Amino acid sequence: MKLPRRAVSVCALACGLALVTSSTAVAAIAPVLITGPSPYAACSQFDNSLTGSTFPNAEVEPQAAVHGSTAIAMWHQDRRSNGGAHGIGVGYSTDGGASWTETTIALTACSANTQPALSNMFRASDPWVSIGADGIAYASALSFNLTVPNNANAVVAARSTDGGATWDHIQPVPGAFFQTADNSTDKNATTADPTKNKTAYTVWDTLTLPTDNPDDNPHTQAYTGPAYFSKTTDGGKTWSQAQIIVNTAKRTQTIGNIIVVDPRNDTLYDFTDLIVQPNTPFQGTRSNAQLAFVKSTDGGATWTQPQVIAPFNSLGVIDPNTGRPARVGDGLESVAIDPSNGKLYVVYESSTMFNKNINQSAGSWDDEILLATSSDGGATWTGPTVIHKLANDMPTFTPTVAVNGGRVAVTYYDSRNLQPGQTANWPTDYWVEYSTDGGATWGGEQHIAGPFDLSTAPVARGFFLGDYEALQPSGSGFLAVFVKTNCDAPYLSGNPLCAPASSNTTPTTNTNPTDVFSTSLP
């Protein structure tokens, strides 16, 4: 059973953060539960005909948008082990995230009212949502099927004019609908223009042959993956034909494209992970994944050539005690812009243990959060500089950045409460830090949630909470939307929620492994 969707006090808060080692951290407002029982439970009838396994009631990888007192969140609903989920879940709030109502968006055959073009799609992934100044909400996601017919996949756009309660004009973006795996769409993001009414932008990459399936797989050994762009200027009723904005050669691709807009001059910035041929030297290291960006000053008609900011130098995350992997936001950036002065903020996870072979090895994982900033439209960059790293070098991962009133916030997970030799569970916490001087210094670390057991999360190439989490300006502060497992410390062995996540192939007592929560941060 799911819990009521109002403030939920997790054990770490009730126990006074006894397991937290940081002496400067303070407790945050109790998280609010967003997600309830899966609205796609009936879709399990199709699971036996599909590859992989399904984790019912597993919600992961949320995105969110805020406009005044309206907040909208989206997430993967019923995550699958080898890509996507039964569908996309939606929550909307009319009180700034104090309470939530759930609804759905018809992107797969798991919804009763799915349009014919998507009726053969049984999976959805990568939700993104953004709200314009006029209150129109724009969403995008991947809709796909690994088996029928021949790995069909698409970037699908939708809009809402009632704060996320209902969605219409659900449609594949022109030039982003494919019937075979020769072309596979991935990692879409949608951004509403902050000053132009009825205008929004969607970006994604399309992986071109040879590839294996439209799973969200970032490996790039033998195909190409340009960045594509589409826009709407009629409030999401129609979208422009996809155009390439970052062209790529063989064995080169983009992934994690995200647009931010400077409201002072309507300059568009698209940030991406530009992955070049393996073992390409960069500034004294050997990294094939590079943080880069392009920009447009004419509404997306033309774009600059990619400018590389820094190598990602990311190894991913493993449990230091067991070697079991977690799937995290490695090789993906989070981006924000200060609307008052156009300053750009980019955060990502990295590893001080990065080696010249690139490959992760025993005893190596991402252990720091880095920040790069630009105050001149990307002409020059400060950093990357380390803004969070644990003294014991434990994993830290999946950062998210937002700016509000000149104040910068970054959220992240870390494993500071994992003890040497602790193998039965993987204590994980969610945190936020702040900067009031443009990212030069950081402090005021605040505890959001945990410790919870990461090893009870659904498995998708590792224990999975999401490639992204969400953080948005809200009022004078921020709204964080994130995922945690429901196995909180002290991990009682008799607690059904502390068993491994139940799937349709490996049933256990844990039929509700994860949920989506929100927290209002001051």
Task: Locate the predicted segments by residue.
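C-terminal PAP-associated
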Residues: 27-522
